[in-house]
Amino acid sequence: MPAPRGILCRPRDIFTEQTVARLARTATITDLDAESDDGTGTVIATPIIRWLESQEAAGNPVDYFNQTVVVQAPSGTSEADVLVMLQALLDRHAMLRARVEEDAAGRWTLTVPEPGTVTAADCLHTIDVLTDDAVIQAGVRLNPAAGQMVSALWVKSTGRLVAIVHHLAIDGVSWRILLEDLNLAWAQHRAGQPVTLPQPGTSFQRWATLLAEHAHDPKVVAQTDTWRQIAATPAALSPASPETDTLNTAGNLAVNLDVETTQMLLGEVPAAFHTGINDILLIAFGLALAEFLGTGAERICIDVEGHGRDEELGADVDLSRTVGWFTAKYPVAMQAAGLTWSQVVSGDPALGAAIKTAKEQLRTLPDGLSYGMLRYLNDNVDLDAADPPIAFNYLGRQGAATADGSGDVWQICWDGLATVSPGVKPPIPLTHTLALNAGTVDTDTGPALCAIWTWAPSVLNHAQVSRLSQLWFDALTGICTHVRGGGGGLTPSDIVAGLSQEQIDELQRQYADS
């Protein structure tokens, strides 16, 4: 969190230390007179930005590569109000003002100008009704080379703001930061006060510099062979065709898991296996893929995306309020443990053993951030294998209900583009044959896991992906059944005693019988 009084305390420290006394020992004093880390100036391209650069080098258009969110404004909001809000965000968050510069070799760097140089009036267009053409034209106005990272539509008839931000400047976590700032700015503006938003802790500029430095750290370089072996795993699906498989021709399927199962996945299941929900979802995806593809115990390589905000790179790194594209992308080779599908869906004891084995496989992987650092930021390392054709990304919990019941808040509308045709998507080639983007959304009855599937129609069809989607949900349900029956337990990476899984299981059996 920011340190307005010169004390640095990160959110994760609160959860780790849990008492005021222990928290006080971890908090550090910052120098309020030190030069501000405002994120302006030259920004080194990060691994994920280098990846996008490689997409352009391959002939794929990237100017329209964006994230779009629809925000419902408080009742009575005017266009003038929106301009004030948008200007506050542009001035506070440096990457929203970034400009891409390309050298003679096609290599990118980014430059961030001072606050005030990008105006909200140049980014915002007002319309009466949201239409396909309006969204298309707003997307076309994005121009990273000209510093046009933001293009927004104010829809007067509905009081909604359509925010289109180039992916170079935004990720899923960033939207939560922007929404928080929108509401803070709104409260100040409505009270007649000048809008003053808190400064982010660590700028994206400094973060990019840290990544470039760590890419040459001997400990990071030592992980090269491990990544090379993983990346060499044979592809489980044919690649997408860049000529025919594009965003506007891709197959799409969105399915929600029931609330009861989702609630178990958010709490009891990760606790039972001493891991995070990301690992559980990925392990279940690996089981479903093995059944779908009929690969048995063969390894399946998956291109995994993580949030990439690893604050361990520096003692004083605080990214809790930093807007930018932090995504880490890296290959993971999943290996099913020879289970029958009936064992999976029934929650058989063998499923628990398979989950523990897969969990340990994931724990032995290097930090996912290091793959991109080595591949894109260290010219002395050769990691040039093609990306796996299957992708997985868990976006976390989306759309949490606001605690303010007055309606005088800005809220993201997750169905805000429901009336817009899929045809507004640009003809950008798909980067994966199959992609699963999952997130937990709040519904009227509770949280529900939402699976959004995207696939290349030259390789897969709707019926096949529908079956795979059901297999994934069946695997997750089977895991929940296993935990309800008392399944779970520790694995070797959870303890420091150096015990094998067999020894841990035997101790747990003895303890259970005592």
Regions found by a protein language model. Name each.
Residues 74-97, 163-180, 251-297, 348-355, ...:
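Acyl activation and transfer enzymes in specialized metabolism, enriched
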Residues 1-2, 23, 82, 281:
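Short, compositionally simple motifs enriched in small residues
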Residues 3, 150-205, 464-481:
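Active-site-proximal acidic secondary-structure segment that organizes catalysis
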Residues 9-12, 93, 97, 179-182, ...:
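Extended, hydrophobic beta-loop-alpha segments that form or line the acyl/peptidyl-thioester binding
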Residues 38-41, 58-66, 83, 94-95, ...:
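His-Asp-centered acyl/peptidyl-transfer active-site segments
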Residues 1-18:
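Phosphopantetheinylated carrier protein domains
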Residues 48-74, 103-130, 134-137, 146-151, ...:
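Acyl/amide activation-and-transfer machinery of modular secondary-metabolite enzymes
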